[in-house]
């Protein structure tokens, strides 16, 4: 009577998914292209069982974030805005000044902007670790180099 067919939808639970760790070297790569590759892994779009409303992606470690490149004149002209939440408290930084002050911030801002807004995006962003140098402190996770 209740015949099982191949048309049944398979639902994957996030707790049953084994998350892998990946290392991406951002040295001499373009900022946006690195961010796109990272977001695909964080969201889990490289897996056959991708589900948009669940955290089924993997963890990502980025090294050499301070050596990321931009095209054109964006190095001097690209602006990042922040606000102190006081009247008249709008501040702007160029890519150059922001990367001198916080070397990992431009890459983190680009990735955060590509993730979904809300609780899912905040949880996905926690799966990202960014290091400005060529060494990272997560060797115990045995990350796969991409």
From Swiss-Prot:
Keyword Coiled coil found: no
Cellular component, GO annotation: cytosolic large ribosomal subunit
Record-annotated disulphide pairs: none
Key word Ribonucleoprotein present: yes
Family matches, as PROSITE patterns: RIBOSOMAL_L13
Example GO biological process: negative regulation of translation
GO function terms (MF aspect): mRNA binding; structural constituent of ribosome
SUPFAM superfamilies, A to Z: Ribosomal protein L13
Range of residues in the leader sequence: none
Family per record: Belongs to the universal ribosomal protein uL13 family.
Assembly with partners or alone: Part of the 50S ribosomal subunit.
Biological role stated in the UniProt entry: This protein is one of the early assembly proteins of the 50S ribosomal subunit, although it is not seen to bind rRNA by itself. It is important during the early stages of 50S assembly.
Annotated protein name in UniProt: Large ribosomal subunit protein uL13
Native source organism of the sequence: Borreliella burgdorferi (strain ATCC 35210 / DSM 4680 / CIP 102532 / B31) (Borrelia burgdorferi)
